[in-house]
Amino acid sequence: GSIPCGESCVYIPCITSIVGCSCKSKVCYKN
């Protein structure tokens, strides 16, 4: 939840979810 993954999730889900990132406030974050 605190580390930006450098990916947005406005239109599509987080591709970085495979490395533990999740969508919060239209941006993908890890932890």
Swiss-Prot record:
Post-translational modification: This is a cyclic peptide. Contains 3 disulfide bonds.
An annotated GO BP: defense response
Keyword Repressor attributed: no
Family annotation (SUPFAM superfamilies): Cyclotides
InterPro entries: Cyclotide, Cyclotide_bracelet_CS, Cyclotide_sf
Pfam family, one: Cyclotide
Key words of the record: Disulfide bond, Knottin, Plant defense
Covalent S-S links between cysteines: 5-21, 9-23, 14-28
Coiled-coil spans in chain: none
Domain notes: The presence of a 'disulfide through disulfide knot' structurally defines this protein as a knottin.
Function according to Swiss-Prot or TrEMBL: Probably participates in a plant defense mechanism.
Family of this protein: Belongs to the cyclotide family. Bracelet subfamily.
Name of this chain's protein: Cyclotide mra3
The organism of origin for this protein: Melicytus ramiflorus (Whitey wood)
Taxonomic lineage from the root: Eukaryota, Viridiplantae, Streptophyta, Embryophyta, Tracheophyta
